[in-house]
Swiss-Prot record:
One of its GO terms (cellular component) is lysosome. Its main location: other. Residues 18-114 form a propeptide. It comes from the Eukaryota. Residues 1-17 form the signal peptide. The keyword Disulfide bond applies. PROSITE patterns: THIOL_PROTEASE_ASN, THIOL_PROTEASE_HIS. This is Cathepsin R.
């Protein structure tokens, strides 16, 4: 009850134009602003400070509970600490899994097949460095380029960063909305029918919408099709083990996801029916001894290296398709 009253007073202060601030957090607030290069007008700073303080208290409470074994992951204050819920939602896409469409074919796992217990495609050199999408909602494009980059190695023998901006600018005829969001399915359709995709070197990321400037002479990767996986973690596991990194959609609309630091992420309110964010599944494994409850998917995000485990997350695996990890998964064929 005390926490509810405290938060109520915070918002009452905002409504009256006089935010109630905790002076003991002044130094921490200043350090955070410097670290993430934040600057505000005087009025805006007070409003953002209230949001930041609320997030900080929530994070500290969660981490105290983690130390008591009440949850399996930790959180930290990051660049999103001053974001309101409305601002955070603008970073999210929203795709109902019932719109899941088939690509070239459907993959099936062979009965009795034995898969490795640990997979990490980063260690094999199939994953480019973590990047930061910024204010452009291009998660879907980062996920798709990551999957194509990995598959292209089988042809070229080298890892070439591909152009996210090429997808942002040019896949609108397929139904994407550039920096306002997109769909990995539509992005694969663009690459397939366009006949190729440029590299990051010739078509660098700008983090904003622009005119399509694709030059076929600079194409570095082509695909022959793409595969949509059934909504099965078992089949997703087989694909990650035998094919390579796989694009996936997940429900990332929660404060716990936004502020994730480390450990195996499990959010009780996560949906498996609606996905809001595109990621790349680059592996899987388990923590400690192999027992129920400690298996994870290793996913690559596009929020920079300061988020999560240097840009990655361990998401709970074999927990009823947690956060929809297997609901909207695809991979390209080369």
């Amino acid at each position: 009850m005390a926490a509810v009253v405290f938060i109520a007073f915070l918002y009452l202060g905002v409504a009256s134009g006089v935010p109630v601030l905790d002076s003991s957090l002044d130094a921490e607030w200043q350090d955070w602003k410097i670290k993430y290069n934040k600057s505000y007008s005087l009025k805006e700073e007070k409003l953002k400070r209230v949001v930041w303080e609320e997030k900080l208290k929530m994070i500290k409470l969660h981490n105290r509970e983690n130390s008591l074994g009440k949850n399996g992951f930790t959180m930290k204050m990051n660049e999103f600490g001053d974001q309101t819920d409305e601002e955070f939602r603008k970073m999210m896409i929203e795709i109902s899994v019932w719109t899941h469409r088939e690509g070239k074919s459907i993959m099936k796992r062979e009965a009795g097949s034995i898969l490795p217990k640990f997979v990490d495609w980063r260690k094999k050199g199939y994953v480019t460095p973590v990047r930061r999408q910024g204010d452009c909602d291009a998660c879907w494009a980062f996920a798709v380029t990551g999957a194509i980059e990995a598959q292209a190695i089988w042809q070229t023998g080298k890892l070439t960063p591909l152009s996210v901006q090429n997808l942002v600018d040019c896949s609108k005829p397929q139904g994407n909305n550039g920096c306002l969001g997109g769909d990995t399915y539509n992005a694969f359709q663009y690459v397939l029918h366009n006949g190729g995709l440029e590299s990051e070197a010739t078509y660098p990321y700008e983090g904003k919408d622009g005119p399509c400037r694709y030059n076929p002479k600079n194409s570095k990767a082509e695909i022959t099709g793409f595969v949509s996986l059934p909504q099965s973690e078992d089949i997703l596991m087989a694909a990650v083990a035998t094919i390579g990194p796989i694009t996936a959609g997940i429900d990332a609309s929660h404060e716990s996801f936004k502020n994730y630091k480390g450990g195996i992420y499990h959010e009780p309110n996560c949906s498996s029916d609606t996905v809001t964010h595109g990621v790349l599944v680059v592996g899987y494994g388990f923590k400690g001894i192999e027992t129920d409850g400690n298996h994870y998917w290793l996913i690559k995000n596009s929020w920079g290296k300061r988020w999560g485990i240097r840009g990655y997350m361990k998401l709970a695996k074999d927990k009823n398709n947690h956060c929809g990890i297997a609901s909207y998964a695809h991979y390209p064929t080369i």
